[in-house]
């Protein structure tokens, strides 16, 4: 079932214009591309929010929508505002009206020609084995960084000369239409700067930067995990003013076939023979640091968990050490020789199991029989 424009803006069907405007402001701010870069779902929702506002803020379109639905609006031709911005003069005005100077008009949003084409910092993904992440290690890594082009002063233009971008006319934004809705998007030709090279720099091929290689030895601390970042000072990109940013090393730790890691705790499922569980024997259990002894209680149950304190991972920020949790899985023999079968039959009889039924099972059947009689 298609969601209605009122549901998109989270308002009722009798909402007045002020309520619609406030709802649009809230939803547009939530899903705006500038706040959700790279999020395709947020981008799609932002388009729907704009589409809903375009219709509900226009009395004629809203009346048609309320009576006939969205299909009646296809093809355009409704209302006097053909720009698609709900009565605002340009792409930037709709955002400055709702969000203030932080979004500003299209002319204020335009990037300066002095802006850097590259960020000062960047992220380097480093893959580690399970053991390397748990215990720490030394790693020599080779990486590529960007350096602002000296020839064109980072502009990407020959001799550093730029002209007004013909696609966006210097605004830094262009209008993109979807159906009868038009919304603002960063100009793909000038990346929002409003300026473009008439002729590309021969040195950097119009990119505004060149790439160089570097290497560094890293001391990976004990206890790092996937998603953690280590900052390496002054190993980032080099900007126009010759300052160098930082490199952030993002850890990607591999999983292990035996041990399961959850922050600083280690989990392991360990097989236990049924006689060991019944008798409560001592067993040897592997940990990340070697074998330890686990004393099973008599009658240990399948799936029962036991905590081995301080047998987990050392916390990367402190001296605390996690635990290892051992979950036992009770195993039964799948085949028996004659001697084993005879022994088990005798054991079964010694527990009072006759006619294929244990005393507790008989008691349960008797209870059920009495339930039917009552």
Swiss-Prot record:
One of its GO terms (biological process) is chaperone cofactor-dependent protein refolding. The keyword Repeat applies. HAMAP family: DnaJ. Residues 4-69 form the J domain. Its main location: cytoplasm. Transmembrane segments: none annotated. Zn(2+) 2 binds at residues 165, 168, 187, 190. Participates actively in the response to hyperosmotic and heat shock by preventing the aggregation of stress-denatured proteins and by disaggregating proteins, also in an autonomous, DnaK-independent fashion. Unfolded proteins bind initially to DnaJ; upon interaction with the DnaJ-bound protein, DnaK hydrolyzes its bound ATP, resulting in the formation of a stable complex. GrpE releases ADP from DnaK; ATP binding to DnaK triggers the release of the substrate protein, thus completing the reaction cycle. Its cofactor is Zn(2+). Zn(2+) 1 binds at residues 149, 152, 201, 204. This is Chaperone protein DnaJ. It comes from the Bacteria. InterPro entries: DnaJ, DnaJ_C, DnaJ_domain, DnaJ_domain_CS, HSP40/DnaJ_pept-bd, HSP_DnaJ_Cys-rich_dom, HSP_DnaJ_Cys-rich_dom_sf, J_dom_sf. Homodimer. CDD domains: DnaJ (cd06257), DnaJ_C (cd10747), DnaJ_zf (cd10719). A zinc finger (CR-type) spans 136-213. Belongs to the DnaJ family. It comes from Campylobacter jejuni subsp. doylei (strain ATCC BAA-1458 / RM4099 / 269.97). It is found in: Cytoplasm. One of its GO terms (cellular component) is cytoplasm. Binds 2 Zn(2+) ions per monomer. Keywords: Chaperone, Cytoplasm, DNA replication, Metal-binding, Repeat, Stress response, Zinc, Zinc-finger. The keyword Flavoprotein does not apply. GO terms for molecular function: ATP binding; heat shock protein binding; unfolded protein binding; zinc ion binding. The J domain is necessary and sufficient to stimulate DnaK ATPase activity. Zinc center 1 plays an important role in the autonomous, DnaK-independent chaperone activity of DnaJ. Zinc center 2 is essential for interaction with DnaK and for DnaJ activity.
């Amino acid at each position: 079932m298609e969601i209605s424009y009122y549901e998109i803006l989270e308002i009722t069907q009798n909402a007045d214009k002020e309520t619609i405007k406030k709802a649009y402001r809230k939803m547009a701010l939530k899903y705006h591309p500038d706040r959700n870069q790279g999020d395709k779902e947020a981008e799609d929702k932002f388009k729907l929010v704009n589409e809903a506002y375009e219709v509900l803020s226009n009395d004629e379109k809203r009346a048609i929508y309320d009576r006939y639905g969205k299909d009646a609006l296809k093809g355009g031709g409704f209302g006097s505002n053909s720009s698609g911005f709900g009565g605002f003069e340009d792409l930037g005005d709709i955002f400055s009206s709702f969000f203030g100077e932080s979004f500003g008009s299209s002319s204020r949003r335009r990037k300066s020609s002095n802006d850097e084409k590259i960020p000062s910092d960047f992220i380097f993904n480093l893959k580690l084995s399970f053991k390397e992440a748990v215990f720490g290690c030394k790693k020599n890594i080779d990486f590529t960084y960007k350096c602002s082009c000296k020839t064109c002063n980072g502009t990407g233009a020959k001799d550093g000369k730029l002209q007004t971008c013909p696609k966006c006319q210097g605004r830094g934004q262009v209008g993109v239409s979807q159906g009868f809705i038009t919304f603002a998007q960063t100009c793909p030709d000038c990346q929002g700067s409003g300026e473009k090279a008439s002729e590309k720099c021969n040195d950097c091929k119009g990119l505004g930067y060149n790439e160089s290689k570097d290497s560094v030895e890293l001391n990976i601390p004990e206890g790092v995990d996937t998603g953690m970042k280590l900052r390496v000072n002054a190993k980032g990109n080099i900007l126009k003013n010759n300052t160098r940013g930082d490199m952030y090393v993002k850890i990607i730790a591999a999983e292990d076939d035996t041990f399961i890691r959850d922050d600083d705790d280690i989990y392991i499922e360990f097989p236990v023979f049924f006689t060991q569980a019944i008798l409560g024997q001592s067993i040897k259990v592997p940990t990340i640091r070697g074998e330890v002894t686990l004393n099973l209680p008599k009658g240990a149950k399948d799936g029962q968990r036991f905590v081995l304190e301080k047998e987990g991972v050392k916390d990367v920020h402190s001296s605390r050490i996690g635990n290892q949790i051992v979950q036992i899985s009770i195993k039964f023999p799948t085949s028996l020789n004659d001697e084993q079968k005879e022994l088990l039959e005798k054991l079964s009889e010694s527990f009072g199991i006759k006619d294929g039924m244990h005393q507790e099972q008989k008691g349960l059947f008797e209870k059920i029989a009495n339930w039917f009689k009552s």
